[in-house]
Amino acid sequence: MPASACLRWAETISCQYPLLRAHAARHGPLSLVHLDAHSDSWTSEDYNHGTMFYHAIREGLVDAAHSIQVGIRTPNPETHGLTILDARWLLDQGPRAAAERIRSVVGSRPAYLTLDIDFLDPAYAPGTGTPVVGGPTTQQARELLLGLRGVNLVGGDQVEVAPAYDALGQITALAGATLAADILYLIGLARAERGAAV
């Protein structure tokens, strides 16, 4: 039976580890495209939202040499071999340049895209547990995502929308739903380009 497309939409970032494990079992080590204010790659034996990608790299689920983190505003000195484009780089160079850099790092390898809603500046997504000022707008995030057409995405997620913290008008939920739809579009497009059922 052919594998189906999967986009995970969750409040907590800890859902990513089992998803990475499942996708890596099918496709081999993944190129990670991680859009977030936080690196989530701190070195620790604990498995939690701050160590997820450290463990994924250490266990061979993620190929760090062909993976990239974008929008980071709480830097971690331990890069574990990941390419890092911090928020200053993103805002100076723009979303199109970031998309091109992602494409050059990932190449044609199977890729997993994860977007933490705190990637956005809290002016556009206040409803999250750990907001950090200085991020991109919703439109800049969409421009970056749509610049990833042709990347071999095999899965993805959009995490950390916390409705209890959202502003009047549910702007975080709207941003999260819109970006999740964009990611799903990219996964479907990649499946079609591979000749898989969409």
Locations of regions flagged by a protein language model:
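Conserved alpha-helical scaffold segments that buttress catalytic/binding sites
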Residues: 1-198
